[in-house]
């Protein structure tokens, strides 16, 4: 029974493989690919720029820089106090 079912499946798969890719799946020509490279690079650059600007704005809007600056100041003051204590 298994052999009876597997043979038609094998024939269908073999037919699909031998048929080749569909026209929409065929590889594009190299010249058209090369022509699109500058557009793709510009699109990538614009996307990267927008994401970087958004990240910088997010950092500016948050209180992270102030907290970091305060933490460093406090830590530096503690180190200075330790120096004066043990000197």
UniProtKB/Swiss-Prot annotation:
Principal place of residence: secreted
Gene Ontology BP annotations: lipid transport; lipoprotein metabolic process; negative regulation of cholesterol transport; negative regulation of lipid catabolic process; negative regulation of very-low-density lipoprotein particle clearance; triglyceride metabolic process; very-low-density lipoprotein particle clearance
Keywords, in A-Z order: Lipid transport, Secreted, Signal, Transport, VLDL
GO MF term list: fatty acid binding; phospholipase inhibitor activity
Subcellular location: Secreted
GO CC field: high-density lipoprotein particle; very-low-density lipoprotein particle
Record's signal peptide: 1-26
Family listed: Belongs to the apolipoprotein C1 family.
Role: Inhibitor of lipoprotein binding to the low density lipoprotein (LDL) receptor, LDL receptor-related protein, and very low density lipoprotein (VLDL) receptor. Associates with high density lipoproteins (HDL) and the triacylglycerol-rich lipoproteins in the plasma and makes up about 10% of the protein of the VLDL and 2% of that of HDL. Appears to interfere directly with fatty acid uptake and is also the major plasma inhibitor of cholesteryl ester transfer protein (CETP). Binds free fatty acids and reduces their intracellular esterification.
Protein name: Apolipoprotein C-I
Organism of derivation: Zalophus californianus
